[in-house]
Amino acid sequence: MIIDAHVHLWKAQTGRREVDGMDRPVRSLTDGLSDFGGEIRQMMPPYMLTGENSPEMLIANMNYAGVNGAVIMGETMDGRQDEYFLAAKRKYPDRLKICAFFDDHEPYTLEGFDGIKICACKLKDPDLLKLFPVFKAARDAGKFVAIELLDGAAQTEELREIAKELPDLMIAIGHFGMVTRPDWQEQIRLARLPNVYVESGGITWLFNEEFYPYPSAVRAIREAAELCGMHKLMWGSDYPRTMVEITYKMSFDFIIKSSELTDEEKRLFLFENARCFYGFDNLPKLPVIPNML
């Protein structure tokens, strides 16, 4: 079985992007395109025609690739999609875990969600300690926190302090600590704490110049495992943005085919760690359907 720890959905993008110190709107167009703060970008594959990034399309991709479960999270550029996530969870309760979205001190709710996503790298005020009440509320409600940090060690000591103060709060650091940036290992070292894990959403984006089968990404996973243990690392795809370059299956196939990881390490990374962290307990077995080739 496989669990994807980092997936995005949206009805229509209503978010923002900072350009020259000013917030510019991000809006869905057609044919997988988006207006990315004044620039037209291929945000998703062109066959996603309407601008909607739907749970039905995600589940179809998961079924085809053999991915049993996924964790849905928001992003500043996508805007708040809470109601859309809740509807997706109602439709696919055994396949999806969903995150509420914390957006720079705007009102938020945890009700109905499994966790909360904090884009700490995009906060106007990067001081994480000022968000301690948000972390504590998640702990008190039995929710996890998914967080993306500024590059390197810019916010690691603050997160370390919070994680130690709230040892019962489960925290997942995204984007594999921004693995291609200087001092990325400082974020990985946080996973030495018992309640902190790391997920690899976006790792194929970060190593896109090298491209499939991403040998440097595999070496980075190996290095991270030496820093915190393979039992603290989880796979994530960053669907659908990474799918403009590769197929969904390719986003984990390079792990399965790697000779640098053992079968047990692959099982932990692709499934078992995320099953334990997110609490997936009723995932369906998926049939293997051959391609028409």
Which stretches of residues belong to each language-model region?
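Hydrophobic faces of well-ordered beta-strands that scaffold small-molecule active sites
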Residues: 3-7, 70-72, 98-100, 114-118, ...
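Active-site beta-loop-alpha junctions enriched in small/polar residues
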Residues: 8-10, 75-76, 101-105, 119-121, ...
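Catalytic pocket-lining loop regions of alpha/beta-barrel enzymes
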Residues: 123-234, 276, 282-293
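Mid-to-C-terminal alpha-helical segments outside catalytic/metal-binding sites
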Residues: 1-5, 12-60, 64, 69, ...
